[in-house]
Amino acid sequence: MSEILESTENVQEPGTGTTDPAPPASTSKINLAVEAVMDMIDALGNFATITRGALGIGNGLSCEIAPSVVDSVFMDKNTYIPVTLALNGKHTDLQILSDTLNNIMDTLTRYTSYTSGNGWEIVDITNGNLPRVIGREDNNQWLMTCDLVVKIYRKDEEPNESELGE
């Protein structure tokens, strides 16, 4: 574990002034695909960088995996998984927030090619639920949410002979 901590850069926790070691890179194929979608969203130049998990204090964007199920399992055990990704936003200006979430959905669903990695590939992104207001905080920040459906093809690498017992 100390090797991992030594090899990562320090990350400042928002609003704390302290730094914590960055977490090790994900090896989950689903998480790698979600991180790729987050990179696509950040490339749009929104009012904030998207984070994973709950929204923090102040204007921001976040995402997290919502309940999803495997859609298809093939004879070779590869799977097609439509992952619902909940996008949440908070901003004092409702128009900026609404425009941002709508732009994310409009742009990502119109791409014709997506990112892939070792053992996974995003094959499509579609709209789940369109952006909608879910509330307004006491500090006058509007809260909105929407869902993207990230369609992932997970392909396992061929097992070697020692794994097959041959």
Regions found by a protein language model. Give the residues of each.
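Conserved acidic
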Residues: 29, 96, 140
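A general secondary-structure boundary signal
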Residues: 34-38, 80, 139-142
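Small/polar-rich, solvent-exposed N-terminal microdomains that initiate assembly or binding
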Residues: 1-75, 99, 111-118, 161-166
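Acidic-leaning, charged glycine-interspersed low-complexity segments
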Residues: 47, 108-166
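Extracellular/virion structural assembly segments
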Residues: 78-80, 90-113
